[in-house]
């Protein structure tokens, strides 16, 4: 920029995402992202200690589930706390999608964007009550932002 305020700032977009999104943008003027209908966080030490999770468990901790959304309809459970700062540590941990391990919330979001489409059926591996459970889910679509 002329003021050099953005000097040195760069962004990287994975080429696989570009190959997936650009044709839809050209053809339709938009791209519709898949949606699970959850909010989540990383599996951190505090969560492991409060719930007694295995020390090597990784995944995406489900803090909220959108009512009547894909995850809710599939039976995925979010934390019952009313605020992020008031978690009860009783939500599910998503550990895999379609047998691909999810090590973080970023992994989950990236996997959905690069490998799935709205309306697609996926298999979700979750850790709940000290055991692994698998559920099937049909992905929704993320509403466009204006």
For each of these PLM feature ranges, what is it?
Residues 2-21, 36:
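Serine endopeptidase catalytic core focused on the charge-relay Asp
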Residues 17-146:
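C-terminal recognition in membrane/secretory proteostasis and scaffolding
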Residues 1-2, 47:
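Active-site proximal helix/loop that lines the substrate pocket
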């Amino acid at each position: 920029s002329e003021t050099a305020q953005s000097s040195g700032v760069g962004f990287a977009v994975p080429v696989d995402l570009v190959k997936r999104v650009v044709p839809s943008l050209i053809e339709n003027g938009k791209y519709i992202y898949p949606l699970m209908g959850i909010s989540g966080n990383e599996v951190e030490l505090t969560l492991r200690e409060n719930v007694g999770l295995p020390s090597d468990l990784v995944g995406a901790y489900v803090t909220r589930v959108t009512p009547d959304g894909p995850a809710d309809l599939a039976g995925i459970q979010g934390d019952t706390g009313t605020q992020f700062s008031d978690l009860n540590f009783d939500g599910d941990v998503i550990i895999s999608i379609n047998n691909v391990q999810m090590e973080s919330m970023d992994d989950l979001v990236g996997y959905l964007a690069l490998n799935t489409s709205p309306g697609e059926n996926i298999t979700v591996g979750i850790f709940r009550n000290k055991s692994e459970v698998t559920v099937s889910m049909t992905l929704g679509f993320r509403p466009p932002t204006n």
